[in-house]
């Protein structure tokens, strides 16, 4: 597994694990980042990234993106 923040633009992966405290994991789940869901990196800008998950685009900070591990 690798952190979502390391995935190249246009590439995707399936979420295998989300690290961090319960509040962080809950927040990411509310945004659609749940285990088994496919996420695609759409854009990177200034350390942040935009990801496509569950038919939505979501912007994440680099620190949050590093908590989402994909296969």
Predicted regions and their residues:
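Compact, glycine-rich, soluble single-domain proteins
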Residues: 1-71
